[in-house]
Amino acid sequence: MGCVTSQEDKAAVERSKQIDKSLRMDGEKAAREVKLLLLGAGESGKSTIVKQMKIIHEKGYSQEECLQYKPVVYSNAIQSMIAIIKAMGQLKIQFGHPDRAEDARQFFALAGHADEGEMSAELSGIMKRLWKDVGVQECFSRSREYQLNDSAEYYLNALDRISAPGYIPTEQDVLRTRVKTTGIVETHFTFKDLHFKMFDVGGQRSERKKWIHCFEGVTAIIFIVAMSEYDLTLAEDQEMNRMMESMKLFDSICNNKWFTETSIILFLNKKDLFEEKIKKSPLTICFPEYTGANTYEEAAAYIQLQFENLNKKKDTKEIYSHFTCATDTNNVQFVFDAVTDVIIKNNLKDCGLF
């Protein structure tokens, strides 16, 4: 009888050890699983960050995948030109050369029938002539007065290359493409022995109600702000300043009861565009109380402070801020490396392994 009890005790001890081991393994596995939620207003650069993860942490874009973006490149270039020509009418800007008015008429006729994935020599020729026109360039320089894609200048400057026979989009061309994100896009990758699940959520106001079920159990939120949009209004609401909308959204995320334990990482994005714009467009457009110089360093630091000051729990919650250029692979790689180190440290702490 005593022998049986002893065997039962041994079995119980063994079971207990197995349970402990299993719990430990589950804890370590949980510490290695990272759920990242990408949040931010529309057109802040969330989808570009997702594309960079594919380039940096997966195998990048194959030639076949790049070719799939060809229609998007053409569509972005054509839509940008359409936006500029239409804005010339609104802003009462004349073409520099009278022949360009006929080119514009031809352009609209051809643009509507452009074969998907192809750009005819006639269409590209017209677009090149229009893009060189001084009136078109004047209108482009006033793009804050209407809605224009960030990639407009990039593609229109590259018309020779992108309209050449046999054109295959480069990874940089792919990074610059703009397609509105609807719904939720999930990306998986492994980095530093961590298994990442990244969720890109539609930033336009109409999409926000779809976010909520992504929130539970999220490791960190990467909130993306387009710094260069301090002087722009929303595509969905011409009265609302984009930076103010971004701050409003950040306030609601940062101080949300669901995220008291969640790391908040702030990407102050489009720093390259901001650096160019701040020379011409004063920060007081968005922040009338700003008295600093219109230099990149001072103005960028001021924007960072405005966002960090929205944090109502400074004693217990830290905002990890980074200045980013989402189209610059090296910059994103460097920043994401730093972000991952913070996540590892916080994850191990949460799982009692640090």
From Swiss-Prot:
Residues annotated as binding Mg(2+): S47, T181
Alphabetically ordered keywords of this record: GTP-binding, Lipoprotein, Magnesium, Metal-binding, Myristate, Nucleotide-binding, Palmitate, Transducer
Region (G4 motif): 265-272
GO molecular function: G protein-coupled receptor binding; G-protein beta/gamma-subunit complex binding; GTP binding; GTPase activity; metal ion binding
G2 motif, as annotated region: 173-181
Family: Belongs to the G-alpha family. G(i/o/t/z) subfamily.
Protein's recorded name: Guanine nucleotide-binding protein G(i) subunit alpha
Lineage, top ranks: Eukaryota, Metazoa, Spiralia, Lophotrochozoa, Mollusca
